[in-house]
A protein has these predicted regions:
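Active-site phosphate-binding strand-loop segment of PLP-dependent enzymes
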Residues: 1-40
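Helix C-cap/helix->beta junction micro-motif
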Residues: 22-23, 134, 171
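PLP-dependent enzyme catalytic core of the Aspartate aminotransferase-like
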Residues: 158, 166-174, 181-215
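Hydrophobic residues in well-ordered beta-strands that form the structural core
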Residues: 29, 92, 175-177
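A short linear hydrophobic-aromatic micro-motif
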Residues: 136-139, 173-179
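Conserved core segment of the aminotransferase class I/II
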Residues: 48-121, 128-130, 211
Length: 215
């Protein structure tokens, strides 16, 4: 889940799929981060039934947003034909070179992913170590993905509006404020998958600096 990093276990997903099936609805499952970490061995959600739709892309887990490549899967043949018809009306086809690059990366995923997952683990560890020393923030450590969603403690004495103004204007550092996700701005999304280790470390220091001197 973005931004919390919560991972839905297979049993819970099966229960939701069963409920959806009984109501004649469809379940759309975003599996963009599926290939990272513990979820890599999970079957695609489409195996849960014909009314389950799975979507994913090469943008997140593989770090290739510039290719603009993704996919949609469903076992409902009639629905699949409707999706194909819609795609033809919107884009007709993707770039052949882009698709070839994406294909080659995906077919080599057993070679590419270990380095990516190791980098993600290092980023998560860096955030964990930083938060262990940052008493004004609290979090639930993400089980998957490449983002964390800590929040400023209610009793931390931090002026939230001033924090964001300083973080952006003075320190030129950006996080996703809570209102992006219909949450209080005491929450912030911090990404640890894309930045280099140096960039991430500097960004975390800047968050602490923008929070102000500890009380």
């Amino acid at each position: 889940h973005n931004p919390t990093g919560t991972v839905l276990d297979p049993a819970a997903l099966r229960e939701i799929a069963s409920l959806v099936q009984s109501r004649g609805a469809y379940l759309l499952v975003d599996e963009t981060y599926r290939d990272l970490g513990a979820t890599a061995d999970h079957p695609f959600a489409t195996w849960l039934g014909e009314r389950v739709i799975s979507v994913a892309s090469l943008s997140k887990a593989y770090g290739l947003p510039g290719l603009r490549l993704g996919w949609l899967m469903t076992r409902d043949r009639a629905l699949n034909e409707r999706f194909l018809a819609a795609k033809e009306q919107i884009v007709i086809s993707g770039g052949v070179l882009d698709e070839e690059v994406g294909y080659q990366v995906y077919r080599r995923r057993s070679v590419e992913l270990p380095a990516i997952t190791a980098a993600v683990a290092r980023g998560r560890a860096a955030v964990r170590e930083w938060l262990a020393t940052e008493s004004r923030l609290e979090w639930v450590e993400p089980a998957g993905g490449v983002v964390a969603f800590p929040r400023i403690k209610a009793d931390a004495g931090v002026d939230v509006a001033r924090f964001y103004a300083r973080l952006n204007g003075e320190f030129r550092t950006w996080v996703g404020p809570g209102h992006w996700f219909e949450q209080d701005d005491r929450y912030m999304r911090i990404g640890f998958g894309w930045p280099t280790p140096t960039e991430l470390a500097e960004g975390l220091v800047n968050v602490s600096r923008a929070l102000g001197a500890p009380g």
